Amino acid sequence: MHHARQEKAAASKPAFDGAVWSCPMSKLMDAYEAAWAADRTPLLIDCTTPSDAGAGTFSPLETFFSYSSEAIIELKKAVVEVSAKKEKTVAQVQDEFAQALLRALKQGQMLVLLCANAAPPFRTKFSAPHALPAELMDVKQVKPVLGADGKVEGAWAEALIHHADTEGWPMKDITLLAKHGILHDNFRVVVVTKFKLEDYAEFLRDEWPLELMQPIKVFTES
């Protein structure tokens, strides 16, 4: 039985070529590395939801992220809180984004932006120099600020750290960043959408810089 499962997994090979890559959940780390090497931000097209699942259910991929130690930002939830329920202001959710981002930068986490089946207004509403800088989507601008040799001063990360330090958030990570300015080498950014492969570009292109991203169809091994 175990041997049969191994054979099935081996048959589900990732394909990191062409306009849209294809990758089983178990090989995502390989996909991240390939996209990083190609200077592209991974845009995961989540195809892991079973066909008989309800519309509002978490997909296996979303569940995987929820149990991971990565920095998760639920952008669809933020849209609902700001626009539908009006429970929070844009400034409030931006501060939440900034805190998650700062922790990820200090601890070397992956910043996972979950869009679900929505087109969150990244460019026109949520992105800001002190919260979710637009440069996060450009690997060529992320790489130079990371690690001991990274140049934070004058780069996009400087405004983010300065704002947090000025606000006096009680976060040890911010104090360390403000004093030493070293951003962890392992920091990465991933965006996840549940739009279908044939639909994602139409829905996301106005708010997200798709030209800087690598679409990756993610599936579960069967």
Model-derived features with residue positions:
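Conformational switch/transducer regions in large eukaryotic molecular machines and scaffolds
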Residues: 1-222
